[in-house]
Amino acid sequence: MGDSRALLDSEEYPNTEAQKDRVLTLEEWQEKWVNHKTGFHQEQGHQLLKKYLDTFLKGEKALRVFFPLCGKAVEMKWFADRGHSVVGVEISELGIRDFFTEQNLSYSEEPIMEIPGAKIFKSSSGNISLYCCNLFDLPRANIGKFDRIWDRGALVAVNPSDRKRYSDVMLSLTRPGFRYLLSVFSYDPTKHAGPPFYVTDGEVKKLFGSVCNIQCLEKVDVFEERHKSWGIDQIIERLYLFTEK
């Protein structure tokens, strides 16, 4: 990070079709957790979220905050500790249990009656509820609306063919006055198949622009040694803020 290379915009990678047919099954995601292939997890939390936390929360109290494809994101406890109510969805039961264990939180679990085979895990404090199910089944559980959505590792993990369906679900969960932070990546998609998938600025605007004002807050070169195995030499993270039009 932070070298002198120019930050490339997504338009400099013209082959936006390279990943369009790429599909990962839910079983493959669950296997990543079983096999500890969770390089996407950030033990110290997300640095750009820390930087823009005040912009995201806007000084408001007792918000409902949604974490799509939450994994064991440490930021869920950050928000709960600040007095907010956190709801997440994750296909891996292992990931959810790891979250509660690693954060030293006691919890209960119960079936979600509206979704066969699904469960909800609730912290004993009552302000963290994690749904173990397919995200696309979640609306059937009537989880209500949210003031804030933190979308990191979610849109970029959804199969490209499911993005419109995904954005429709996300927008259906927003309350009036919502604020939505989205993190996406730009890299050469002909060299790495994903996930995380390459998402262009144009795609972000197509998916969310009809309902949201869209502001790109920052672009950061996040290239690390592990990215060399992807066959790339640069990866740019873009952080967007969506607000209600």
From Swiss-Prot:
SUPFAM superfamilies: S-adenosyl-L-methionine-dependent methyltransferases
Keyword entries, A-Z: Acetylation, Cytoplasm, Methyltransferase, S-adenosyl-L-methionine, Transferase
UniProt subcellular location: Cytoplasm
Pfam families the UniProt entry points to: TPMT (PF05724)
Keyword S-adenosyl-L-methionine: yes
InterPro entries, A to Z: SAM-dependent_MTases_sf, Thiopurine_S-MeTrfase, TPMT
Binding residue positions for S-adenosyl-L-methionine: 29-40, 69, 90, 152
A single MF term (Gene Ontology): thiopurine S-methyltransferase activity
E.C. number: 2.1.1.67
Binding site for substrate: F40
Residues the record lists as N6-acetyllysine modifications: K58
Family: Belongs to the class I-like SAM-binding methyltransferase superfamily. TPMT family.
Protein name as annotated: Thiopurine S-methyltransferase
